[in-house]
């Protein structure tokens, strides 16, 4: 695959509308079960997998399941079983990881983070959406990386004409430093 690897995230609602994707815990668990052989067959082309599945874009919001901790526990545990160790999964927010009760607690170190709003704090909406230095989220992540070797990725917001669009507001080189 030319040295490239994919970061996977599955979602039922890709339009980004503030509606549920219609997903259920049982449906998601069945789909993970169906995906497991395929994930294992192509594991060499997969860098990591974001937990996804719930809500708009698989970002764990705008869904009835966003408040169902039992479903979240089961989904993350199923994904950790689906991918062979040491492969990791990624979650968007540290508080989601902290709230998990896993089937195998020893797998917690295989849960990394997908910073879906990487701005290095250069936007007023960054706190709570970005891992901004000196915040609790940032401190938790920096402590975790001292003892765990997990995957972490980031997405710089794209150019759009909304309050979330940042292309004109951020300096990529400053953010990357």
Regions picked out by a protein language model, each given a short descriptive name:
Residues 10-14, 39, 50-55, 93-95:
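Short, flexible loop/turn elements at secondary-structure junctions
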Residues 1, 12-28, 57-66:
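Surface-exposed, active-site-proximal loop segments in enzymatic domains
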């Amino acid at each position: 695959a030319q040295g490239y690897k994919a970061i996977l995230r599955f979602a039922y609602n890709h339009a980004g509308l503030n509606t549920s994707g219609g997903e259920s815990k049982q449906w998601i668990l069945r789909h993970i079960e169906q995906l497991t052989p395929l994930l294992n067959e192509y594991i060499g082309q997969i860098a990591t997998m974001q937990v996804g599945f719930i809500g708009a874009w698989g970002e764990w919001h705008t869904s009835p399941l966003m408040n169902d901790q039992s479903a979240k526990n089961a989904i993350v545990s199923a994904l950790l079983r689906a991918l062979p160790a040491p492969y990791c999964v990624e979650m968007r927010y540290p508080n989601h990881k902290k709230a998990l009760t896993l089937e195998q607690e020893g797998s917690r170190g295989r849960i990394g983070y997908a910073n879906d709003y990487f701005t290095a704090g250069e936007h007023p909406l960054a706190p709570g959406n970005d891992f901004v230095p000196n915040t609790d989220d940032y401190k938790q992540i920096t402590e975790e990386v001292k003892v765990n070797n997990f995957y972490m990725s980031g997405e710089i917001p794209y150019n759009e004409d909304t309050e979330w669009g940042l292309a004109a507001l951020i300096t990529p080189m400053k953010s990357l430093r």
